[in-house]
Amino acid sequence: MSLEENLSRVVARHDELRALLSTSAGGGEGFVRMSRELADLAPVVEAIGRLDDAKAELAGARALLDDPDMRDLAREEVLRLEAEIPALEHGVKLLLLPRDEADDRGVILEVRAGTGGDEAALFAGDLLRMYERYAQERGWRFEVMEASDTDIGGIKEASAAISGRGVFARLKFESGVHRVQRVPVTEGGGRIHTSAATVAVLPEAEEVDVEIEEKDLRIDTYRSQGAGGQHVNTTDSAVRITHLPSGVVAQCQDEKSQHKNKAKAMRMLRTKLYDHARQTADDARAEARRVQVGSGDRSERIRTYNFPQGRVTDHRIGLTLHRLPEVLAGTALDEVIEPLIAEDQATRMAEIGG
């Protein structure tokens, strides 16, 4: 379907909804649903109107180019409108893109050390701190839900809840394998080692999103463990919850209170189940995303952080920045995220006639 056909379809649907609502008695689910759809279409139709007006003005200005008295003024108008119309078209295409209903949600961020032993765990800690600083930069709330530390200050695995406006929209392309190339602190010979850590970004679920029945849960309690596996609590305050039908597991041991650990574990479990259902229900969109920016599968390397060269390379879009310290500090992470969002938008716009 061409862009023009898409625009005509949107305007026709907008007019149809207005007519239906004007003759409706109001109330009921159908009325509410149509009202919401009309509200969603209103800014699109307004943008289409501005685009149509600009195209009409351009046609009028071009018609005056043959008039000796108006030629200079008409030429200026033609140049202005020819520069303005592509931007208006781009704005309309962005509004036509289907919204990911999860974009406005917070996320559960999971970071795990991959290949590379102690160095991989140290790098996993670097990534977790990078996202924490980035959250602070954007005014989001960052809360560690679960962390398994190593003796030398690294992280085997950790989960964090990030809350704020549009968190998932900005972080969803961070899922995948992140690779680091540097000389480990434990390396005496100065040799560069390659290690990896995995990142998963799950849109956080609300209670209304996922129905969890108590009979489907197995709840185990155990003693919290610190670095090296030693027990750090004399009571069974740590909680592990298994959703029996799916096999999904969530656990938490960060709080001293078993009640608080259970609440956090349930929050993570709900999010994991929501993400599973969301992906299952929309395989087509998941496949489109795999084509556009990579699947975020744990086996896929998405980004390399090269310390000797001070370089960050995102392999999905061929982007290289020589600003590694700033990226890891969270202050320049947007310089990686913005191009990924733009690439995703460009690919989806092409699908609607762009």
From Swiss-Prot:
Subcellular location: Cytoplasm
Keyword Cytoplasm applies: yes
GO cellular component: cytoplasm
Keyword Cytoplasm: yes
Entry superkingdom: Bacteria
Pfam families given in the database record: PCRF (PF03462), RF-1 (PF00472)
Spans traversing the lipid bilayer: none
Disulfide bond positions: none
Any one Gene Ontology molecular-function term assigned to this protein's record: translation release factor activity, codon specific
Location of N5-methylglutamine modifications: 230
PROSITE patterns cross-referenced by the UniProt entry: RF_PROK_I
Post-translational modification: Methylated by PrmC. Methylation increases the termination efficiency of RF1.
Assigned keywords, A-Z: Cytoplasm, Methylation, Protein biosynthesis
Predominant cellular place of this UniProt entry's protein: cytoplasm
Gene3D superfamilies registered for this protein in UniProt: 3.30.160.20, 3.30.70.1660, 6.10.140.1950
Family from the record: Belongs to the prokaryotic/mitochondrial release factor family.
Function per UniProt: Peptide chain release factor 1 directs the termination of translation in response to the peptide chain termination codons UAG and UAA.
Protein name from the UniProt record: Peptide chain release factor 1
